[in-house]
């Protein structure tokens, strides 16, 4: 259920980003309405690495179970469960980093939500995603995600994220899409006291984009992104980002 936004956060539920790379997957259709996806993923730079805490089964991995309900031609939603494990990525200044390891996290959200606190991390993540087309020119979509981080031998933390968007298919030209998105990038809302304090403030991600189909093979997407309370700190000034993405298909 990936989207058309420019930012990584806007593309899909961040819980899918805990790991990515080399994967083995099974896709099964019970009928036209219900689909089951199972997957096992290992970062590409780890899969063929013979060193300890690497390879297919001795290092970073992520397993996925997802069920998708295609209610009609205009609506679908999915429920996801992800189990992930990451050896220590060395983001604790008191621990010597291991550069052979893939960093922990979703690559979006606050620094705390992507910190391993210098220990191996086991993650159990749960997600919901849905999209509903209200008319040929208007669709709404969104997701929510929760993850429990177990910092092995050190403590636990809880991460939350969500987003909602309006999409305008064929806006201005067939094949083009406009969109407006608002959401909360991954935020660590709970953290065991021996590890410190969780993120103190809520930060919002607002994004507007327009994917314009120049030709059947070339798409240009200008976008503007507004981040409030960067890194979950209301004392930080808001950030506004402009971006242009061009995609060539051959």
Ranges and model annotations:
Residues 166, 238-250:
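Outer-membrane beta-barrel "beta-signal"
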Residues 32-38, 63, 69-79, 87-90, ...:
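Repeated loop/turn-to-beta-strand initiation elements of outer-membrane beta-barrel proteins
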Residues 38-42, 79-83, 142-146, 164, ...:
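Transmembrane beta-barrel strands of outer-membrane/channel proteins
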Residues 83-101, 179-201:
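Outer-membrane beta-barrel translocator/channel fold
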Residues 28-30, 69-71, 132, 168-170, ...:
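Residue-level signature of outer-membrane beta-barrel architecture
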